[in-house]
Amino acid sequence: NGKTQTTAPDVSNTQVGVSMFGLDYRYVNGRISSRGQYISATLSDTEAYNVAGSKDIGSAMMGYYLEGAYNVLPIENKQKLDLFVRYENFNTHQETAGSLVANDAYHRNEMTYGFSYHLANGAVFKADYQSKGTAVDGADNKGQINMGVGVFF
C-alpha cells in the first residue's frame, strides 16, 4: 500500500526549485598546474519546505576552490608526482528565507595539502591532509587524513 513506518515529516506537497551558475578552469604549463571552480545557486520555496519538514535549507548557496600543483618528477617521465595545495570555501546559508537565521556553521572552509602519484595514464594514488573550519567564532578546526586510488578512462 506504499505506507512506511518512517517518522520523517511529510514534505510531499513542497517543491524546491534550483537555479545554478558555475565557472571552472584548468591550467597546465610544464610541471605546474592549477584549477578552480566557482558555483552559485539560488533555491526557491525554501521557506515552505523548511516549515513543512522542520529543516533549515538556505535560499542561496555559494562555493569555490582554488588548487595549485607542482610535478616533482622529471618532465620526461610517464609517471607524475604532483604536490598540491587547495583552498575551499563554501556557504550553504549564503542567504536564508523567512524567519530562518543564517547558521555560521554552514559557512565552511578547508585547506588541503597532499600529493597525487599518477602511476600510469588513468591510474592515480592520492593522499592528503585536510584542515576544516567554519565561520563560527571560537570553533575548533578539525583535521583529517584522506587516501584513495582513482581509476579513470
Regions found by a protein language model. Give the residues of each.
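Outer-membrane beta-barrel pore domains
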Residues: 2-153
